[in-house]
Amino acid sequence: MSLRRGVLTLLVALFPLMGARPTPAAVETTFPCSESMREGVEFWKNVWTRWTLEQVVLHDTDHPSIVYEVFELPPPAGEVYTDGQREYVKGRREALQARLSAIELKATGATPLSDDEKALALKITEVAGSAGITGASQRVRSQRGLRERFRRGIEISGRYHDAFVAVFREAGLPEDLADLPHVESSFQVAARSSAGAVGVWQFTRGAARKFMLMTPGLDERLDPIAAARGAARYLKTAYDALGSWPLAITSYNHGIEGMRVARDRFGLDFPKILDEYDGRTFGFASKNFYKEFLAAREIASDPAAYFPEGLVPDSPLTHDRVRINRPTAVHGLASRYSVPLPGLAAINPAWTARALRGSAPLPAGAEIWLPQGTLERVANLGKKTKAQPKAQAVDAPRADTMRP
């Protein structure tokens, strides 16, 4: 694209300081937490702030406060299990399931329990009553501790939080939605799920096409700010369709249509949906998604209380940005702004390999991040032509290096 035809709208990103969070009462009204959900919220707070990557928890899926065991994982404690660790966890889980099956069998036949069995049964009955013994062996789940990962996510969020808040504020949505990446990705730009979801906001390719730019040259899922706008569009659509934030947030995991079916059966009674909705794919992940969001929001609102050893938040960095009005080659942008292409690519992670090879342009409407001061430098060098209108200062969400 020739920059001599006035095809760029130039914007200097001026970012607001971190604002105060809403009061707890305001949050409670928007994001209610029933007494029945509190058990799950506290469980996820423990997963993220108490139990480490070296620990594995065996718990009841329906009653997560029933924690049977917390055991140490054989080293090394990496990001994912080794084959040996996976087998070790499986063995511990199956051994517990066998013990629970024996307890259920004895309870059915009125056979006395051993002291160890009585202690194990008591863990269940204190929370779920005697009826909880039935099927307990089928409700055992293993959960690895994620304290280190969540802690690092809190630190990384310093890079993006204010920008995300500004996006949701501009969209007229609750600002607390900016904490959703704690659940989805721990704020990791390069996060990829087994389902093909990508980026901080974890969009699949199909969903992303509806809410952001997806072309051979650009994948906005990998630009945290652009993806936040896509998330805002999605969540507004979900809220308008479903009528409550618990339903809309859960749809981020389960889909709008899936939650519409649940709402049509049970109305807006979200706790009842969690207890009684038996949709085929409405499993543990979907049932816990909103509780995880509530837990993440509580931790993020007062991180020092959960990480007393201290945190070192990433510094929010400012950048200039431009929005292109027609398809543009990235090499042309690098030349125009006298910024080495590798440097531009580092702060524009949404650019695809094809764009960097020059075989696919960036689409019209794409926003390009430039090193802070680039527009001022270009202006001072006298590079103001009819093709490059004067930069307009506006308020815009903050961005930073956006490195993985």
Task: Indicate residue ranges for each PLM-predicted region.
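Extracytoplasmic and endomembrane cell-envelope/extracellular-matrix remodeling and assembly machinery
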Residues: D115, G132-R159, A163-A166, E170-A171, ...
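Short, surface-exposed glycine/acidic/tryptophan-bearing loops
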Residues: A191-F211
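Alpha-helical scaffolds flanking conserved acidic
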Residues: P174-P181, V198, W245-T250
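An acidic, Gly/Ser/Thr/Pro-rich helix-cap/linker signature
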Residues: R21-A171
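Bacterial N-terminal signal peptides
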Residues: T9-M18
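Bacterial N-terminal signal peptides that target proteins for export
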Residues: M1-L10
